[in-house]
Amino acid sequence: MKRRYFGTDGIRGQSNVFPMTPDLAMRVGIAAGTIFRRGNHRHRVVIGKDTRLSGYMLENAMVAGFTAAGLDAFILGPIPTPAVAMLTRSLRADLGVMISASHNPYEDNGIKLFGPDGYKLSDDIEAEIEDLLERDLNAQLAKSDDIGRAKRVDGVHDRYIEHAKRTLPRDVTLQGLRIAIDCANGAAYKVAPAVLWELGAEVVTIGNEPNGTNINLNCGSTSPVALQKKVDEVRADIGIALDGDADRVIIVDENGSIVDGDQLMAVIAESWAESQQLRGNGIVATVMSNLGLERFLDDKGLGLARTKVGDRYVVEHMRQHNYNVGGEQSGHIVLSDYGTTGDGLVAALQILAAVKRTGRTVSEVCRRFEPVPQLLRNVRISGGKPLEDIQVQKAIADAEAELARNGRLVIRPSGTEPLIRVMAEGDDRAQIERIVNELIGTISNVRTAA
């Protein structure tokens, strides 16, 4: 069934434009609150957000919805997404909410929902919420004496700081490291530098002055140029770039080179396998992860299980098959020993542990494999289903046959934007570029004709 509200990572869109309106946010609160209002205990929801201008507006709307449904609302304020997942469990809440559009610009916002176990909701539960959103919600409102209460909770940042610090192995200290960190003017602008400093590092921070409109603006994991310059300027040993809600991370080595999520997963997988911490004899990644990662793991006797794009699908596979390392090339790294969702800071701490234990530089530690040439391009669409066109399907089949075992092809609609994503990778860069350009042309022609 086609979804109207939920995408691959909750509900997302431009603020004050459907579906990201205060009205819908309140209705989501009522609908989700109704579904999780089970049992005779006093029900509660924890609500966090990042630093976007629209965050307070949507926070208030969701508080209204949840309290109207009879849940007490614990308001956390600006805080990372993984902290919301953690606090949902530790505060014994029935539901957790993160108001954020992750790496998107400030004009956008979104709603991510977590169950009482701290995991993102399943497709089935999201479908239940969508079904309720299409109905008259007045019948779901709590009785007058059962309306929930709202309160801001103090000390939540300290809880997360201590949690993050505990994920660094006890035999490791960050003393002697100069770390530059870019907080993307987002949710981790207070907690991330504090964690690194308390663990002994010399910390140089940028992207820690949010004003409501500068989240992810020329900063953070999707725009690491400022961090690269800062690493060079202060001669840092490493740069850490988080995104707006701190659930993803990109590393900059001492030479200013970018280290993506695939390389980070390789480092953690190899390190954890050596220490016998790795479960599942491999890791979980998406179809977008580089073929070079797969070959590296294979050489180490480790496997790579692939899922469709979206960290929630990575996590689902990890849970079903007992893996404890998974993630995405974009920098969503999920370490289930320490959390239920991607955590950029905790992932960075595992890289720092590998650096300290080996005594090698970040560039030496993090260049675990040579990436296979990979090209990703997008085609914007305004409607229709170009991937169902016979010409497009034939072009895809021909490209897959040409690549055979020497490469991979992934073509999929974006879960958050009106785009078709075309990715090809293989050992022959010229071949990859030609294949992608031909497919883009075919899809564009079909789109135009439609």
UniProtKB/Swiss-Prot annotation:
Family annotation (PROSITE patterns): PGM_PMM
Record carries keyword Phosphoprotein:
yes
E.C. number: 5.4.2.10
What InterPro entries does the record point to?
A-D-PHexomutase_a/b/a-I (IPR005844), A-D-PHexomutase_a/b/a-I/II/III (IPR016055), A-D-PHexomutase_a/b/a-II (IPR005845), A-D-PHexomutase_a/b/a-III (IPR005846), A-D-PHexomutase_C (IPR005843), A-D-PHexomutase_C_sf (IPR036900), A-D-PHexomutase_CS (IPR016066), Alpha-D-phosphohexomutase_SF (IPR005841)
Residue numbers carrying Phosphoserine: 102
Q: How is the cofactor bound?
A: Binds 1 Mg(2+) ion per subunit.
Query: What's in the keyword line of the UniProt record?
Result: Isomerase, Magnesium, Metal-binding, Phosphoprotein
Q: Which family does it belong to?
A: Belongs to the phosphohexose mutase family.
Per the entry, what this protein does is:
Catalyzes the conversion of glucosamine-6-phosphate to glucosamine-1-phosphate.
Specify the protein name.
Answer: Phosphoglucosamine mutase
Its source organism is: Rhizobium johnstonii (strain DSM 114642 / LMG 32736 / 3841)
